């Protein structure tokens, strides 16, 4: 299977709240071949505002592309593993979410899309994988918000997961990330229209401004300083990328996905984990800053664990930019 994004119906899905989503569609990419016994799969999870194209060399995500880590002989070895990356439930890149059509109305779900949890996101991923024939995961791994999913997986499906890796991530949701805070920021915009902005052309300017702020916070400007000496050229490139994202992402997804992570906290459940654990943090990272107490907690877990602190000027972007420094860690997670 190649780099094209595919879409698969997994049927109706009942959320943790008890509400039922009809005919959930899941967008995903897959690389490599699934073994006859279905046990050679690896799930790569994506971040808060990105999607399955994080594995594409031409894609720019907030956490950086993982394309250099994917391929024959690389840590995400397509000769050995069946690599899947699916768009999260509630996101904006092909999976059922606020920008997809509500069958009951024929219109985008918009603000009527139900609240979801991280367990729902992982549950939909599980349904996709089992529909594809996967019976076991050699690893679940991803950066930032994706690392929270990777931690949730061995708690929710302990018998299915061999290893879990969280890169530039944490054991709780990011401080300050909440559905209420995101909704309040968006509601201040004249593009909001009471949340019914789909009928008014969306929120392109608001999302563009938010994306510019986010990418600067993540360290993208620092990266571009090393690549482009001309400040005007750097700003133009940053603006183009942020404008492109703003044209494709749905503002309601910011609210839905923030809400999904609010209750995430595995600090008191580390003793339940039986999967091999990798935890990589970066200094400095304004989103998930390293914390000695978290490092001690990870290292004290009962399965084999590896806690690594990278010193990088690229902050939260180190997940993709510093991919060479991640190679050894991912090979530990996925040993030959």
Predicted features and spans:
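Conserved acidic catalytic loop of the alpha/beta-hydrolase fold
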Residues: 106-108, 112, 119-138
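Alpha/beta-hydrolase-fold enzymes
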Residues: 160-243
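Catalytic active-site module of serine/aspartate enzymes centered on a nucleophile-bearing elbow/loop
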Residues: 304-336
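N-terminal cap/lid subdomain of alpha/beta-hydrolase-fold enzymes
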Residues: 29, 38-102
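Conserved hydrolase catalytic core segment
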Residues: 136-176
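Catalytic-loop region of hydrolases
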Residues: 1-44, 58
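Conserved alpha/beta-hydrolase "acid-adjacent" motif
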Residues: 286-292
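Short beta-strand/loop motif that positions the catalytic acidic residue
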Residues: 273, 279-281
């Amino acid at each position: 299977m190649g780099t094209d994004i595919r879409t698969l119906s997994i049927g109706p899905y009942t959320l943790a709240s008890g509400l039922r989503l009809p005919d959930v569609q899941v967008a995903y990419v897959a690389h490599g071949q699934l073994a006859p016994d279905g046990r050679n799969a690896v799930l790569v999870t994506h971040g808060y505002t990105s999607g399955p194209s994080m594995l594409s060399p031409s894609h720019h995500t907030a956490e950086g592309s993982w394309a250099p880590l994917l391929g024959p002989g690389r840590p995400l070895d397509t000769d050995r593993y069946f690599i899947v990356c699916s768009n999260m439930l509630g996101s904006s890149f092909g999976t059922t979410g606020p920008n997809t059509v509500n069958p009951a109305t024929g219109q985008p779900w918009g603000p009527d899309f139900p609240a979801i949890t991280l367990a729902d996101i992982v549950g939909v991923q599980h349904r996709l994988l089992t529909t594809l024939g996967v019976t076991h995961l050699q690893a679940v791994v991803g950066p930032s918000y994706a690392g929270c999913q990777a931690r949730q997986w061995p708690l929710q499906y302990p018998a299915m997961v061999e290893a879990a890796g969280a890169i530039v991530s944490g054991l709780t949701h990011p401080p300050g990330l909440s559905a209420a805070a995101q909704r309040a920021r968006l509601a201040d915009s004249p593009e909001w229209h009471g949340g019914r902005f789909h009928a008014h052309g969306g929120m392109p300017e608001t999302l563009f401004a938010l994306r510019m702020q986010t990418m600067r916070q993540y360290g993208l400007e620092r990266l571009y300083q090393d690549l482009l000496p001309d400040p005007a050229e750097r700003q133009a490139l940053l603006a183009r990328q942020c404008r492109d994202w703003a044209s494709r992402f749905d503002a309601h997804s910011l609210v839905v996905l923030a809400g999904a992570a609010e209750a995430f906290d595995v600090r008191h459940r580390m003793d339940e984990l039986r999967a091999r654990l990798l935890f990589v943090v970066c200094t400095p990272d304004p989103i998930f800053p390293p914390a000695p107490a978290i490092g001690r907690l990870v290292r004290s877990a009962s399965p084999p664990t590896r806690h690594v602190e990278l010193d990088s000027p690229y902050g939260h972007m180190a997940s993709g930019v510093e991919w060479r420094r991640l190679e050894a860690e991912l090979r530990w997670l996925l040993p030959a």
